[in-house]
């Protein structure tokens, strides 16, 4: 891998993440960092429906259950154009910062448009980091 991380202890989860997190909580496993890039909309194999606007808060709340006692960071990327960075700030402040302290920041994601020199909004990112 060109990233140089092929031997690093990283678990890439592309399955039903909520079920994975629930299993990890039952097993007592903990993680120092979380990177999530949830879809705007999706359907599970049994017809379950995922809508970012409805499911992100409870999912982030669930995921905090696998954070270690001294986590390093929690990153959320979203390419849902209607999701403001302030929503990610609220989620991370409410669910992570209140428990662990640290610092939260969020910003809009954009694609540069060469012809205009402007950026085309395409989502938001939010990051909590320990201090």
Describe each PLM feature range.
Residues 1-35:
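S-adenosyl-L-methionine
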Residues 13-17, 59, 84, 88:
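General structural feature for long, well-ordered alpha-helical segments within catalytic domains
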Residues 14, 31-62:
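Mobile active-site "lid"/loop adjacent to the S-adenosyl-L-methionine
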Residues 16-18, 40, 80:
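Active-site-proximal loop/turn and secondary-structure-junction residues that shape catalytic pockets
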Residues 22, 43, 83:
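Conserved protein kinase catalytic core
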Residues 25-26, 46-49, 87-89:
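Short amphipathic alpha-helical segments
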Residues 64-69:
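A short, conserved beta-to-alpha structural element at the edge of catalytic cores
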Residues 70-131:
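C-terminal catalytic and target-recognition region of SAM-dependent MTase-like enzymes
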């Amino acid at each position: 891998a060109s990233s140089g991380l092929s031997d690093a202890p990283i678990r890439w989860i592309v399955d039903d993440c909520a079920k994975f997190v629930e299993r990890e909580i039952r097993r007592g496993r903990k993680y120092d960092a979380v990177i999530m890039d949830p879809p705007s909309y999706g359907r599970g194999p049994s017809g379950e429906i995922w809508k970012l606007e409805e499911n992100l808060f409870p999912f982030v709340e669930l995921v905090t259950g696998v954070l270690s006692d001294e986590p390093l960071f929690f990153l959320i990327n979203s390419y849902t154009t209607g999701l403001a960075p302030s929503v990610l700030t609220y989620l991370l402040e409410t669910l992570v910062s209140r428990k662990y302290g640290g610092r939260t920041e969020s910003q809009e994601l954009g694609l540069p448009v060469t012809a205009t020199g402007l950026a085309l909004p395409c989502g938001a990112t939010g990051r909590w980091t320990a201090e």
